[in-house]
């Protein structure tokens, strides 16, 4: 029994053996997605996590991170904060954005110099039982804006059931799902928090993006997500990033 436990421990360790080497590359591409308005207090408000891909000026995040911040004349500006070579966060204006609400994804085109980009990998090769990792800002800026990394195991690849704010919308979504077809989503055995939304789910050895964290199962109230995390999170497969990117090149 002791020998079996040792073997299992070694197998688990080897799955994340390259994480320490991959992390510097991953963290260089992690950004903060939020809003900025002079009359707001605080002026900058974090909405979620994002990460840079492609040519270094395209950010991936969740569509729900943008909800309620776009389309209104008096809405705060949608901005992204990137970490400069001096380690300080720099605010970048979002020049335009594209949404895929069906898959809860969004692409943001930002101004300025290119940021180190992550490679979008092949999410079709992800299997149940795979050990992955994700990085983001789980509890916002409470402890400062420092990206945090968690390990995750793919516990299930299951049909998506994205949350809706009302029963009526749930019914409409179900109808659209039947019309447009359903898609699979990664269920993760991992502790994530609302601030992780939009962060990359990646291969811990190569750093390639295999999914986007999009929701956390919350037991009870939203506040209980911090005090009593469910240990269950979900991620959108990366193939939908590729499809959205191709539509808006």
Regions found by a protein language model. Give the residues of each.
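Active-site substrate-binding loop(s) of clan PA
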Residues: 21-22, 69, 95-97, 111-146
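Bacterial N-terminal signal peptides
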Residues: 2-10
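Beta-strand/loop subdomains of soluble extracytoplasmic proteins
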Residues: 76-79, 85-94, 128-133, 147-171
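Catalytic-histidine neighborhood of serine endopeptidases
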Residues: 54-100
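N-terminal signal peptide c-region/cleavage motif recognized by signal peptidases
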Residues: 12-14
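Active-site region of chymotrypsin-like
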Residues: 26-43, 109-119, 148-246
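A conserved glycine-rich beta-strand in the N-terminal activation segment of trypsin-fold
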Residues: 17-19, 36-58, 62, 90-93, ...
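Short, well-ordered loop/turn sites that connect or cap secondary structure elements
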Residues: 53-54, 126-127, 204
């Amino acid at each position: 029994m002791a020998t079996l436990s040792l073997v299992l421990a070694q197998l688990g360790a080897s799955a994340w053996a390259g994480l320490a080497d991959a992390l510097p590359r991953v963290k260089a591409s992690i950004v903060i997605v939020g809003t900025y308005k002079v009359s707001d207090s605080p002026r900058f408000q974090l909405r979620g996590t994002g990460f840079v891909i492609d040519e270094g000026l395209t950010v991936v995040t969740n569509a729900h991170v943008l909800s309620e911040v776009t389309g209104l004349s008096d809405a705060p500006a949608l901005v992204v904060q990137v970490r400069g070579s001096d380690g300080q966060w720099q605010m970048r204006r979002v020049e335009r954005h594209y949404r895929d609400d069906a898959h809860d994804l969004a692409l943001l085109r930002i101004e300025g110099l290119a940021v180190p980009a992550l490679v979008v990998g092949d999410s079709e090769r992800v299997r149940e039982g795979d050990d992955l990792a994700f990085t983001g800002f789980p509890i916002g800026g409470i402890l400062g804006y420092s990206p945090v990394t968690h390990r995750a195991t793919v516990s299930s690849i299951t049909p998506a059931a994205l949350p809706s704010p009302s029963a009526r919308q749930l019914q409409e979504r179900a109808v659209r799902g039947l019309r447009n077809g359903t898609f699979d989503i990664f269920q993760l055995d991992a502790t994530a928090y609302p601030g992780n939304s939009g962060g990359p789910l990646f291969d811990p050895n190569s750093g390639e993006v295999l999914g986007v964290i999009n929701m956390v199962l919350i037991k009870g109230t939203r506040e209980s997500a911090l005090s009593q995390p469910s240990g269950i999170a979900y991620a959108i497969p990366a193939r939908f990033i590729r499809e959205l990117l191709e539509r808006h090149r």
